[in-house]
Design a protein with these regions (language model features):
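Conserved "landmark" site that anchors the functional core of diverse proteins
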Residues: 1-138
Length: 138
């Protein structure tokens, strides 16, 4: 695993920055697997994992040392044991034709390919319930 860059985020948090989402997911899995007391939260994003700590329980320097050590562990990112969720999608957005044109397919083909793909939430955004989806099919 690549050594992440550490970016301070005040006295109670820091970001671990890597190059891409495919590095974030195993990094998050490694951190979650060895999470010590004092780590309040682990928040994955597109290229970072935010680590929030309680400095009364785990000094920030010790937290950074733990995180960098955990980052050297190779872990597979595992999907949570939850059943798939199927959603009804209306493929009638104003940008459907433009998106299809960019992909050099027609709107029906774009809708078919999108509907047949398996998607998973890689991380959530700042708005409650807004998940960023990824698919191995795209």
């Amino acid at each position: 695993m690549v050594t992440p860059r550490v970016r301070p985020m005040g006295e109670r948090a820091f970001l671990l920055e890597v190059g891409a989402l495919d590095e974030v997911l195993p990094l998050h899995a490694a951190l979650a697997a060895s999470r010590p007391d004092g780590v309040i939260d682990l928040v994955p994003a597109a290229r970072t994992v935010l680590v929030r700590v309680d400095p009364r329980v785990l000094p920030p320097a010790a937290a950074r040392s733990w995180a960098l050590g955990a980052a050297t562990e190779t872990r597979e990112a595992t999907d949570a044991a939850s059943p798939p969720v199927e959603l009804d999608i209306a493929y009638d957005g104003a940008d459907l034709a433009d998106t299809a044109r960019l992909l050099r397919v027609d709107a029906h083909e774009l809708a078919r390919r999108h509907a047949e793909a398996d998607w998973r939430v890689a991380f959530t955004g700042f708005a409650p319930g807004f998940g960023y989806l990824v698919s191995d099919d795209w």
